[in-house]
């Protein structure tokens, strides 16, 4: 295919990587760029739901993800005063999905799995330390302006997928709004090996625990 039939993807997070693999498996050439020198590891989310797992199965990466994560067939909302408020058994979805459970796994592990697959493919170009700065479009396709270690560069493609995060340069330069709000409270996200099951009766593998004073989950 000519270069202008290539799909450009900005951002090598879970969305960008998954889109790249989906397109490449269907014979569509892809250029995936990432502003960082390596794949980001500060991705906050860690839950993969049944529809996402079905999609990842179609992409051929579900087995690797299962090896990296924890299978959770149920999850809870809890209150420190009342105990279990609600319990969800994902097994009820067994006739609607091939994966009636959630997988708890850091998102960066998925991006590593997918990029390893992309690097085996001839129609994919994965480039790091490439930062999007702007974009334009004409009847022939799209131009993505980027900064590289060697200086400014233009990438040409038929389409552009913006997966460059909450502060997306591409979205901003296109004037696309991202309405929302910011909570005034400060939040701390941490990983721990603390044995919560020793302190909460009937604790599910995933539990969101609310407290009226400390607000923890």
List the model feature ranges, each with a label.
Residues 128-142:
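A conserved short coil-to-beta-strand element within the FAD-binding core of flavoproteins
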Residues 13-14, 39, 43, 165:
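Residue-level detector of alpha-helix initiation sites
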Residues 44, 49-117, 136:
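Active-site-adjacent segment of FAD-dependent monooxygenases/related oxidoreductases
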Residues 24-44:
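Glycine-rich FAD pyrophosphate-binding loop
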Residues 2-15:
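Beta1/beta-strand and adjacent pyrophosphate-binding region of the FAD-binding site
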């Amino acid at each position: 295919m000519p270069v202008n039939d290539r799909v450009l993807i900005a951002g090598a997070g879970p969305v960008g990587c998954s889109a790249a693999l989906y397109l490449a498996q269907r014979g569509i050439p892809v250029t995936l760029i990432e502003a960082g020198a390596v794949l980001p590891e500060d991705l906050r989310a860690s839950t993969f739901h049944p529809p996402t797992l079905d999609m990842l199965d179609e992409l051929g990466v579900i087995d690797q993800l299962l090896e990296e994560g924890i299978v959770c067939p149920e999850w809870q909302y809890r209150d420190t005063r009342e105990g279990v408020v609600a319990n969800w058994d994902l097994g009820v979805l067994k006739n609607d999905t091939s994966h009636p459970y959630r997988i708890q796994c850091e998102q960066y592990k998925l991006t590593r799995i997918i990029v390893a697959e992309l690097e085996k493919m001839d129609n994919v170009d994965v480039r790091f330390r490439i930062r999007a700065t702007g974009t334009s479009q004409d009847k022939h396709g799209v131009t993505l302006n980027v900064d590289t270690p060697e200086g400014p560069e233009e990438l040409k493609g038929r389409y552009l997928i913006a997966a460059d995060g909450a502060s997306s340069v591409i979205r901003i330069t296109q004037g696309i709004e991202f309405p929302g709000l910011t909570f005034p409270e400060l939040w701390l996200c941490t990983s721990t090996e603390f044995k919560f099951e020793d302190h909460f009766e009937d604790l599910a593998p995933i539990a969101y625990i609310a407290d009226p004073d400390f607000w923890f989950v």
